[in-house]
Amino acid sequence: MFRYLTAGESHGPQLTAIIEGIPAGLSLSEEQINIDLARRQCGYGRGGRMLIEKDQVEILSGVRWGKTIGSPITLCVRNRDWENWHEKMSPHERFHDDKIRVTRSRPGHADLPGAMKYNHHDVRNILERSSARETAVRVAVGAVAKALLSQFEIEVCGFVAELGGIKAIRPSLPLAALKDMAAKSELFTYDKSVEEEMKRLIDTVRDEGDTVGGVIEVNAVGVPPGLGSHVQWDRKLDARLAMAVLSIQAFKGVEIGIGFQAAASTGSKVHDEIFYDSARIAHGEQSGFYRKSNNAGGIEGGISNGEEIVVRAAMKPIPTLYKPLRSVDIVSKEPYEATVERSDVCAVPAASVVAEAVVAIELADAFMVKFGGDSITEIKRNYQSYLDYLRAF
């Protein structure tokens, strides 16, 4: 089982993650994790904080001489902005100052419901942890998950599929080619024809003091049939993926495969017919069974079926606006325009990296549940035995 916890506030000294369940013998370096951290900080429409922070991970435990040793892995991402906040966010009582309390809650954020739940009269106690800054360390965890999955030729990649109603058309190309296209795009999209239109929209929205959302898509190839389970609600792979993606700040909807389109069609047009060709095995495929369509998005009955995993999710516009919405002061109860925190105009490209990370984490967990062992060597042996079984099935 692959599990993790994160800790840390947006303007605290650091973000921390502890990962348990990574087998011994996995090659892992700070450099490979930092690649994904840098991707998260890119993308057209990001805000001023990206000029301050240059995220770098520190591996504090669980890795020796470039290899995991089987014990919990501790990851740390320092907040460079901490030097400007060390008194405001200090754990020490001597720095307490009621004059810097934030009492104007922002619509669309956790500010008000969080303050009500935890009996806080300073919403900074809520907004610091609810901030999407937390996703930096989740991306680091996702990089570890991707390192594990890559040992078994499973690849995960996220893209921007839509921005502010402008839809990208996915080319019929292998995932590796789409990944290369997105890497060259400021918006992490696979459709270059709409990129300039998307950028113009972001510029317009910025000038208006507003924000814009979109739709991300995460694909995974090489996933074998048999991950997840139908026998309990909380082991269904699609349910796990949906929960993980919806846990990302500002995400409000998720679908697997064609998702909501299926509700407007008939069963004969939705369900993917099953075929068999023994020649596929000779060409290195995992199984002779296959589909000619993938409306299910690679998951049926909560179990991966061997086709490409396709997850799409909706991200709402960021609720921190430079043209703030009306709100109410939680102490005086007087109406005000909501507090303005430094923010992005559009974080959909960055969110595609975060979604990629959490999908990889869930796939790594499902993979370890199915093939788990204490070392990479043991897991590879287990996995090879399963592949031999599938080809004979």
Swiss-Prot record:
Top-rank taxon of the source lineage equals Bacteria
Per the annotation, how and in what number is the cofactor bound? Reduced FMN (FMNH(2)).
Q: Indicate which residues the UniProt annotation says bind NADP(+).
A: 40, 46
What EC number(s) does this enzyme carry? Answer: 4.2.3.5
What are the protein's UniProt keywords?
A: Amino-acid biosynthesis, Aromatic amino acid biosynthesis, FAD, Flavoprotein, FMN, Lyase, NADP
Q: Which GO terms describe its molecular function?
A: chorismate synthase activity; FMN binding
Its EC top class is lyase
The membrane-spanning stretches of this chain are none
State its role.
Answer: This reaction introduces a second double bond into the aromatic ring system.
As for family, the record states:
Belongs to the chorismate synthase family.
- SUBUNIT field: Homotetramer.
What's this protein's name?
Chorismate synthase
- The gene designation is aroC
